[in-house]
């Protein structure tokens, strides 16, 4: 080396052979040529060439001079760089340059030349590649480690390489760059932050997207150097995350993006960083937490991520953010769930509980995204979501917000179509989600028009897609209908009914538009538009759009003709689709992308277009039924037993025969139905008869061969078929045959002659047949019918107890256990009622006599002869039959007028009967009559007595019934402003006088000033007033107050001279007045109008008499607590199984706002089936929660009563029942007047049978559950058995020395007299009633209230306390239903979270007989 140094010091530069001196004196081209030769020389040299190394040392030094390093020509610079790279290779490990500054200049120079790599198409690229390869292979830059400015050199190199890499480079370029950079990291002592930044910056999303190759280069570098670089990465994140030193790097703001990228590159890079994220998840800074949550969502959710299993503490900490207080964080967590479910099914279990809480989040967007996450995963693969997750979606179909409900419903529909309809995952998957079809249809029970329209759309697109070929579509519908639950079937039937009704409304509108324009037609058109508007979303806008559409129809004949075809009964499915397409095309405007008018009309067209059913469809459906009958169908493959399929198919056809009767008019269809009539299955034959009745109007003229074959079958069914078939056979004859009188005579005569009172088995069908003939043709058989009723029905059947009943302690038994004699008696009562409903007059006093007979049955507890032969369950049945018969007759104006007040009051007591089923079914029939506006308003007052029912859920249902009936009347008055003459019979507030009068005559109300009895009266009054006063519309509070004041100025018309009776009346008025004063702040205002009191109930006010006395005892004041009435739109209780309805929620939701799905103007009693949640989220939010119905009654305390009082009131009934002697058997129907005399004398004495009353339990929940388990073991006999004590009647009310006078028929209320109620309507009602009564039999008998065994209180003077529990089946049929648009039954699968059975808090009244 000494020699070489000498040579260098000599300063003489030796050039390779053939190369002349290279200086600034030669041209650029010559310089390049010479340099190329130098390059070639150095390239060929290796490290072992010591002589050459020494020879060219000065040349090496010369090439590093500023002349070359700063030369303006790039080719010169490139060649010099290649020389220098080879020089470093040849002279390694010692470089010929010793000056640090010179070394820095050289390496910065080489780095600058590397920029030439960028242009891969350059002719010099290979030389640039050589340069890169050389310095990478030799690791030339490692020389710089000793330099002070090494960091600057390395940083510049890294920046250069990252900036030049592009997709034109091959793998070798990439590899050499990685080699070059990795050697610097792996062999150096440290990695500066600046250098680290040059690598990490390429991972930032913005840079990553700009230069994917730089990202790949950084990724490869980090993978190669993971172990060496990890401490520096850790230090960087520690500085930024833990110490907050964001100034150390410009990348501080991208720290979370970097963590994600680094984790994806190599998780080992973050071994020490991930624990720091746990602290960040608990940061107080919302935005910071959000950033960490977003980061971890990507890390945990990535496809192959194992982070959750590797770092469980971090996973648990992350799950905790699902409950974060900051909304965007919770939203982010929920969005992450779908990726996690799809990529990591094993984590579904961990997520389920957190998603459950979030599905009840107060934020709409979060609840919405929970659904989206679950549905997205389910649509990818059903196995990814468990049943719990699907249930969360199911719950949200009842959410308060439409957007959430819609998402949930559409999600379920898509899942159903994919896995059930298209069977994409096999039968097991289809079975798992079989509940979806029922659930979606149950939503049709909702009150919101949006929900119902969406159900219709889902049905047409996802459940039975309308674009399927006809046979396929009908097969789909056939098996769907066969597998739906009963409530879903009712919903589907209602859907078709609503669509059909709307179709008729639109048809009427088109007909009106076609008429010449007059004021009358304009009014009719407006009225029709209003009706149609109510069937569309957003009634305000819909009204404007419908007016516009009406104008379009008037002006555009083509659109009108298309619409006319669409609503025609003969319109086929294909035609319907064409019409809809044409109308929307004509109304559309290409320039207007969003057209709300067109959207609204589309809604209308969707509802009225017959896209499923036409003549071809009915024919295909009949063929499908025939296949099942022949055994050639795929019933078993579809998972439906053949019998069930046939029965469901006929039921489906029956429903369609109501909505699409014209589509049945084909010989093939009628022949198939005729074959069904002859089948053994009673239900199938019944349905076939009903289809004939609905569709057979043209059979006689168009299908004579069908007529000939059908007639003998109908005769046979009417005479000897099962009762229901006999009934339908009579109605078929009435609908089909013009010679019906002849046919009726041929049936009536032989049946009439063959009636045998001793042959019970063969009496029921004749009685049913004769009853329906009497209803349809009362004049044809007037004389024989009157004789038949007087002699046979009354004398031979009702007044005779031929067989002793079975001894049992039960109060109710299933139908099959009822004695044949009682079943005959029930049919005899129904036959009398049908006869009277057919006559529609009381000219022969038959109605009066029948009412006396019915009230006598009620009065005698169902044992008309009072011989004690009838069993208790049979007596219950007869009481129910009598009570129902009176309610039925009261719906006919001519009979309502002759029902005396005593008879009405006695009938009302049926709602407090000791037998639960009697109360339940009677209330059902009462509710139906009221909701159809058939029963007079005074019958709504009977609902007040439901406050005395010991079963909390019965009270809750009664309340819902009241809400519906009040709303029905208010809605009717809104829509029919011109019915002011009916105001007395429709305005709900007018129920108050009837309620006051009924409660004043309540047999429980014995002592005028008795506090306990008055508290009972108060509860009954509040039961009605709470709902009436919920809204103070039109100053109704003042109106009610004025009404009560006016009553105090009158006397009781039932006993105007009875001082005690009048005092009771005034006392009840004072109770009502105190309730009004305590619950209203506007009661003292001027009443909007002077109330009119019913003359049958109250005398005219005496102008000389001013009754200002307060009749209440002073201590009663404390029981009137001030406060506003609860909102009437309490949703949910009526839709739950009775085991949970009415229970108070433990969450804050019970004291927060309750809002229905519908708008505030909609009927609030919709069966929203909204459950009460017992759990609340960690934040007390309630916006999305569903609400339970609190009991209408507050908890009551046990009575304190003197023993003397008790002993006096507990005496057994002392009323003597006059025996019916043999001579009385000769009574005609008119002789029943005598029978009524005793009844009138003791009419006020009969106390209602009371169910066992129970007191509230103050025991803890675990004690309650323990008792529950004990009670479950009790036998059914014990559940239904009457009270253990002897029955206690109520002390008789004093009679004022005579029988009350019968009200003459002329003294009628102002109820409107619709004389002609069609027999068909009556028959339809009866059919529905029979179905509902049948439903009662399908329930478990655990419905009765059972008294638990409690120790008696030792202290004297206290009454016993008993705890009652309702362990009722969730399958029980609810009697009081809310304003379901479908039917009076409501689906009961809506309990979304199980609730514990709570103690029913009801006071035990010692003055009353125990209730069952």
From Swiss-Prot:
Record field: compositional bias (Basic residues): 1402-1412
Entry annotated with the keyword Zinc-finger: no
HEAT repeats: 383-419
Keyword Metal-binding: no
Biased composition (Basic and acidic residues): 1172-1184, 1196-1212, 1223-1241, 1263-1272
Disordered: annotated span: 1137-1412
Subcellular location: Nucleus
Sorted UniProt keywords: Cell cycle, Cell division, Mitosis, Nucleus, Repeat
Protein name: Sister chromatid cohesion protein PDS5 homolog B
Record organism: Gallus gallus (Chicken)
Lineage, uppermost ranks: Eukaryota, Metazoa, Chordata, Craniata, Vertebrata
